[in-house]
Amino acid sequence: VSIFAEIHTANAEDEPAFVRAVEGIAELKLANGMQVLLFPDVSKPTVTVNLTFFVGSRHEGYGEAGMAHLLEHMLFKGTTARPAIPAELTKRGAQFNGTTWLDRTNYYETLSASDENLEFAISMEADRMINSLIKGEDLASEMTVVRNEFERGENSPQRVLMQRIFST
């Protein structure tokens, strides 16, 4: 908790508020309403930062199919401070990805456990959630990627079944 507080607090009212702890998992709430679940596990040689936003494809309106998934892809395109997020994560040896589902979108990275890597991951996530660069040429190329992923899913009987089940 201390490294999180050190990274993201400019003054006392910005400090995460403790909500509760259940079976070693501490829940904190930031001033902006973001929920933080902190689960230290000193037996693991890695640190994982996973952000989940409760917005997904079911929140898309008519004519917006695929927009949540497209935005997920676009947030890997970089920021002014970090123009090559995937390259930076790869250089640090991270495993990373993002996923979109009906009711959520998440982004995660797993790195070697260190205060430096934890600080990097939290800082990088905060930066890309606010300062992502969304360029027309990137939108065009990622629309093709997302469309191809969607079409592959249309040919999967399991995916079609799941979509029909969850659409009710």
Predicted features along the sequence, with ranges:
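Histidine-acidic residue clusters that define the catalytic metal-binding segment
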Residues: 11-27, 107, 167-168
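Solvent-exposed coil/turn segments that connect beta secondary-structure elements
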Residues: 31, 41-43, 52-56, 79-80, ...
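M16/insulysin-pitrilysin zinc metalloprotease superfamily fold
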Residues: 78-79, 110-143
